[in-house]
């Protein structure tokens, strides 16, 4: 309680002191010693009208405080200085010292402070970089560093021994004694638990070792960990410094910190109590200083200065009024003497403009330049305007002269000697721009102008051609209208006609060939501009930059030859030769844009004409001209080669696209006219004109492509950059070649599919012709094939011709275009892929044809078995081949003739498929009608049917496939089975049997006698032996077409083999037919096919 009462007493005392201080008179009173001061010496001058700057007298504490917190030492020094100002004598001495150092003797301190405030901005620029004389020149960061170094250089005090109780066992003992260390190394932990390493900011205790010095702490973290910093973070301090400290130690440290704080508060209060008078004195001193500063600001100049200045000003004005006439006359005399001397001194200068003009008009350029340089060397007074005007006239004359010289450099026919003299004169005249570079720019612009002129002329010619074409179209339209009306028009009518007849510009077809001719001439003219001007331009640049101006002159004379010997090595321009090369590259870029746009506009219909190839040849010639010695820079040659490769690539790509487009075009124009055997080079395929047109397209396009690739390959040997482009071009050509074949195959497949659909929609067929096609008007070309089946055969022939002849021929002819970049195995695989594609396509179209013919054959086979006028259950005796069999054979004869004439190489394959289908049709019809029309077959019917089947097999044997043979065996077995069943049923039910005919008496002697399979086969063999050869001779004319590949002498043994197979399955007479079905019966020899 006593401490609280003491605190209350101290606060009351402090409040009472402040109230007394507030009642004091704060006005400034001059000290008694001020009357004893010496008078102040002051120069008479105009008092400054500017307002006094109060801020100049105040020390710059605010700016410093805004940046950093001032140290205790600095605060003490500033307080001492302020206290010293309050005394009168010290103030006077300080003012004198400051006034003497600034050169203003006798000035008061207030005036000096004001002058400093005013002249602060003037002093800013006069600082020599030494010690700063004002606060804003102080490097505050450097000042803070120095203060920190001063603090760290001091030694840390020895830690006082902490009085306290003995620690409990297990607790960390606080440090009792530590050696004093440098301040920059360690500082004491505020909790008195150890020492904090200032570099690593780690706690050092008696039990722990020194932390690692390799660990570095950034400034941001240091500001948060230093406890006397403004940015101190207590949580971060405890988590880092005391991360290993126990809770008991932290509590003990916190208790010690609180007791220390309490002790310090007591000490502060005691300090205020003991030094209360000192604090009051300080407050009084501060108030005195403030009042003195305010007075200084109110009267900065002192008394009497303004009056003295006004008196002196009045005296000066009266003196000027008295002596003014004398001064004027003296000034006029001085001016006259000055003008006279100037005229005498610069008389040559006044004649200089006329002298220079005379020299220029006479062609004495060197004399004019010398006079000009002489005038430039004269040192003229800056205040004489007449001389300036004379020099301005000289400059005007020389400016016109320089313009004349620059104009002469634009002459395209200027020789190198004149050019050298012109450049030398311009260099002596010190032009604003480089004359040599001006000349090079002029020549470069001239080349660009020539290129643009070519473009303008080309557009004008194209426009004239379009107008002529349009006028011709109008006249043609008028003539057609006259012919339609049949009336002769008068002049008036013709004028009305001009107004009436209008032709749409879009409908007018402009002559693409003539336009392409103009485009070719345009590219040729552009290339000629480059070839004729770029090498000369480059040689001129080389001569200029090598210092040998006249050595590359193409227009030389004797004087030029003499000048060549005297030319010295010198550099005429500040630019480099690489910049000239950049000019040429830009020119070639302009040329490239024009050539590429024109080349892409060539009409594709004229692609085989020489316009595009001639343009490429022109660019190639330009490349060869550029490759001559010192003709152009290497970069220009590379750029032109690139242009050649690009337009060649465009041309080849357009050729490839033209081949594919032409392939599609000719595929839509199939005329169905078979070509002669000579036109197809004795090929067995009766092709149309379509494959030959395709061949013509491919050959025309690939020959042009081959020539272009060969030319590019020869140029690529000189440049490695073109190899990649050539490889890309070759790959695209190969793919385009193969795609053309695939596209043609796809078109042939579409044609075949369309023909198949047209045949499938037809309901009635009559000998291979549909009624629809029979009624087709004769609008087709004479000699064209109309029958859809024959057209399918023609498509098959076209496919076979492409597969067997055309693909290999064209591939072997043009494979060397891309063969070097590919392996031989890959090369052969391409051809095999083409052949496989056409083979697969041929199979598809062949299916369409055989399907259409199979319908005819099925109808004929059905008529043969069911509608031939014979009852197979009561057939007459076998006497030979029936007419129905011959009619059936005629169907195959017609097919044979059709295929032989249209696709002879496919004859065996087609007939083999059709015959196999015929046998399958027989088998299908027998199975379908087994319970109806063919449920009963007697012995004579069996012999007749088996005999005719053997006849078919003998005649068509050369086209029989293994599958057809197996089907025939199945058919024979089925017929045998039906016959045996029919005869067995007749024996079992004799009442229902018909009376045997006369022809059957030899076959069946007793109705109740059963007939075995061997007996039926024996009867069939007997008929075959007696009648087969005879029937073959009788129908030799009908079957002659089938005998071409298989002679008649080889046919008789064939049925024997068939019967032997039957006989092998019926060897045991004791076994009935049912038991033999599982042991080799021809019925189960092959699955039945519908």
Swiss-Prot record:
Keywords: Cytoplasm, Exocytosis, Phosphoprotein, Secreted, Transport. SUPFAM superfamilies: Cullin repeat-like (SSF74788). Residues 45-69 have a biased composition (Low complexity). It is found in: Cytoplasm, Cytosol; Secreted, Extracellular exosome. Residues 18-128, 759-783, 987-1010, 1046-1090 are annotated as: Disordered. GO terms for cellular component: cytosol; exocyst; extracellular exosome; plasma membrane; plasmodesma. One of its GO terms (biological process) is acceptance of pollen. Residues 109-124, 998-1009 have a biased composition (Basic and acidic residues). Residues 1058-1082 have a biased composition (Polar residues). It comes from the Eukaryota. The modification Phosphoserine is found at residue 180. The keyword Protein transport does not apply. Disruption phenotype: No visible phenotype under normal growth conditions, but the double mutant sec5a-1 and sec5b-1 is male gametophytic lethal due to defect in pollen germination and pollen tube growth. InterPro entries: Cullin_repeat-like_dom_sf, EXOC2/Sec5, EXOC2/Sec5_N_dom. Its main location: cytoplasm. Component of the exocyst complex involved in the docking of exocytic vesicles with fusion sites on the plasma membrane during regulated or polarized secretion. Involved in polarized cell growth and organ morphogenesis. During cytokinesis, involved in cell plate initiation, cell plate maturation and formation of new primary cell wall. Probable component of an exocyst subcomplex specifically involved in autophagy-related, Golgi-independent membrane traffic to the vacuole. Regulates autophagosome formation and autophagy-related Golgi-independent import into the vacuole. Belongs to the SEC5 family. The exocyst complex is composed of SEC3, SEC5, SEC6, SEC8, SEC10, EXO70A1 and EXO84B. Interacts with SEC3A and EXO70B1. Binds to EXO70H1 and EXO70B2. Binds directly to B1L. This is Exocyst complex component SEC5A. It comes from Arabidopsis thaliana (Mouse-ear cress).
